[in-house]
Amino acid sequence: MSELKIKAAKAAIAYIEDDMVIGVGTGSTVNFFIKELAAIKHKIEACVASSKATEALLRAEGIPVIDLNSVQDLPIYVDGADEVNERGEMIKGGGGALTREKIVANVATQFICIVDESKVVKRLGEFPVAVEVIPMARSFVARQIVKLGGDPEYREGFVTDNGNIILDVFNLNFSTPMALEDSLNVIPGVVENGVFAKRLADKVLVASASGVNNLK
């Protein structure tokens, strides 16, 4: 599996141009991308990190990291997904960085999703949806999610970079992913959720034994 993730990471490097500021996601596949990026760090201007973990990895490779607030234009954002379909809709947030990932993805002009073939699905929903919640609202939000048909589970011992908690939600109805994304976000106490149906991936680079294909 690592070999496929490395393939996908290498394929994304082809989209990096000189003097770019690059948005960098979070997760195991992205970690391989950071390793590849280190080889051309002299060509890029800097990176914007979607998590403290990613920032630490970038700095460890000697890659400059800048704050998103200092960036007006972000040409490209590279990140993985827990699930992705052929339309570029995704479930993200297995690593708990979904809120910052969604922010950086929305700033970026182009979102390149890098995955191995096991992450490609016809219909989203097998993987649970991470919902970032303000701690005091945890029980209330969980009850509201149950009303939507979901089965929320508190992610024990995990605190997001924003100081919040995560509810992992199973069995949600993905017949209309965009409506689901909205219905979760309007619950008071919800910061963000891991359904990416409004900000789609522009390119989905899928690695398999035979090579890397662009799903979109």
From Swiss-Prot:
Coiled coil: none annotated. It catalyses: aldehydo-D-ribose 5-phosphate = D-ribulose 5-phosphate. Substrate binds at residues 26-29, 79-82, 92-95, 119. GO terms for biological process: D-ribose metabolic process; pentose-phosphate shunt, non-oxidative branch. InterPro entries: NagB/RpiA_transferase-like (IPR037171), Ribose5P_isomerase_typA_subgr (IPR020672), Ribose5P_isomerase_type_A (IPR004788). The keyword ATP-binding does not apply. One of its GO terms (cellular component) is cytosol. Pfam families: Rib_5-P_isom_A. Pathway: Carbohydrate degradation; pentose phosphate pathway; D-ribose 5-phosphate from D-ribulose 5-phosphate (non-oxidative stage): step 1/1. The active site is at residue 101. It is an enzyme of class 5 (isomerase). GO terms for molecular function: ribose-5-phosphate isomerase activity. Its EC number is 5.3.1.6. Keywords: Isomerase. Belongs to the ribose 5-phosphate isomerase family. Catalyzes the reversible conversion of ribose-5-phosphate to ribulose 5-phosphate. Homodimer. This is Ribose-5-phosphate isomerase A. The lineage of its organism: Bacteria, Pseudomonadati, Pseudomonadota, Gammaproteobacteria, Legionellales. The gene is rpiA.
